[in-house]
A protein has these predicted regions:
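Low-complexity, acidic Ser/Thr/Pro/Gly-rich terminal tails and inter-domain linkers that flank the onset
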Residues: 33-61, 74-76
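Predominantly extracellular/secreted Zn2+-dependent metalloproteases
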Residues: 57-62, 67-70, 74, 86-115, ...
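Bacterial signal peptide processing site
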Residues: 25-28
Length: 368
């Protein structure tokens, strides 16, 4: 899953368009003498407009289900956009609300855990500049034939953590008839993986990597054991550890957290887990939620500590919680600061946020 956006920018919803990510700290329009502050600022409504269009109203089963997305900077100063939540490159997040006959259509793409955004993760639009990209909706479940409704729709809170304003960022609606087709989501490899006990390795893991992954599995399993024991043996109450990561205490929510960690522990203890080393992205790891129990580890994973904040063991907790068959978590907020804020503003979402589970399990700094 995707993570560690540190609240770099603010988002404001548009009416028929959407206001996207914040301003960069560079001089504005020289003619007007406008000067931007050097740090991120909250944008006005409509600073960046997003429009959605389709070339055709009907898409056959053998055709790619594509739409055109245009982002336009409507201001007199440059704006900087985080690529992860734009269609600038490949689609990595559920940026669209897709429905069929009024029912939500599932996003079947991967859930990433990322390190903090770097300069290279942003793009800049000059005043009046537009960026147009063609987006393939193949990561959504288009297996049924019918009239699909599509719009760009991203939660402000999901994009920037709980420090962002509540609400949805929406574009115009587009309706298109799509003939059902097989999923384009990557399926598990048919290649027989190397097997060690209940843990398999694929993606050409080296001997050193397999040893590191086994240590990470042991660390993650120990965290799952500790979390389950804590929630099972501690008298349910507003303890510091619980409230910090899951918000205001209620017995129902405590039991939800316990049920989730019991499932995470069970996955570590009893399920046939595959760890894949093929990912070369700068992220920590990712999973396909409907493909348990395969975890793809990426470059940042190898440099993470074994335990502690954003650790190897914690990364495996994070990814394990994403599986629909385990806890079915999402990514609503990223990083410790935003995860803590999410627990305050929305305990329900905190209980559905992978980072909150990871940080509860890592318990760094230690909370009783």
């Amino acid at each position: 899953m995707s993570k560690n956006l540190r609240g770099n920018f603010k988002w404001l919803a548009g009416i028929a368009s959407v206001s996207l990510l914040g301003a960069c700290g560079v001089p504005g329009d020289a003619a007007s003498g406008e000067q931007l502050v050097g740090e991120a600022q909250e944008l006005r409504q409509g600073d960046v407009a997003v429009s959605l269009s389709a070339k055709t109203s009907t898409i056959g089963a053998q055709e790619r289900a594509t739409l055109s997305v245009t982002l336009t900077n409507t201001t007199r100063h440059p704006v900087r956009l985080l690529k992860w939540y734009t269609p600038a490159e490949e689609l990595e997040e559920p940026l669209f609300s897709v429905t069929l006959n009024g029912e939500a259509v599932a996003f079947e793409g991967p859930h990433y855990k990322r390190p903090a955004a770097r300069d290279t993760d942003f793009l800049t639009l000059a005043p009046g500049e537009s960026l147009t990209r063609t987006v393939d909706l193949g990561l959504y479940d288009l297996s049924r034939t019918g009239n699909y409704g599509v719009r760009f729709e991203v939660e402000a809170q999901k994009a920037h953590g709980s420090s962002a304003k509540q609400g949805l960022l929406k574009s115009n609606d587009v309706n298109v008839w799509i003939e059902g087709r097989a999923s384009s989501v990557q399926q598990p490899s048919d290649v027989t993986p190397s097997l060690t006990s209940s843990i398999s390795y694929s993606g050409r893991c080296s001997t050193t990597q397999m040893s590191t992954l086994l240590d990470a599995m042991n660390a993650g399993s120990a965290m799952a054991d500790n979390s389950t024991a804590y929630l099972s043996t501690t008298t349910p109450a507003a303890t510091a550890r619980y409230v910090t990561w899951f918000g205001a205490f209620s017995l129902t929510n405590w039991n939800t957290a316990k049920t989730q960690f019991v499932a995470i522990k069970d996955a570590f203890d009893t399920k046939p887990i595959t760890l894949d080393c093929s990912c070369k992205k700068s992220y920590y790891a990712y999973v396909y939620p409907n493909q348990p129990y395969k975890i793809y580890v990426c470059n940042a994973f190898w440099n993470a500590p074994m335990t502690g904040t954003d650790s190897k063991g914690g990364t495996l907790i994070h990814e394990m919680s994403h599986f629909t068959a385990v806890a079915g978590t999402d990514d609503h907020a990223y990083g410790q600061t935003n995860a803590k804020s999410l627990a305050i503003s929305s305990p329900t979402q905190a209980l559905n946020n992978a980072d909150n589970h990871e940080y509860f399990a890592e318990n760094t700094p230690f909370l009783q």
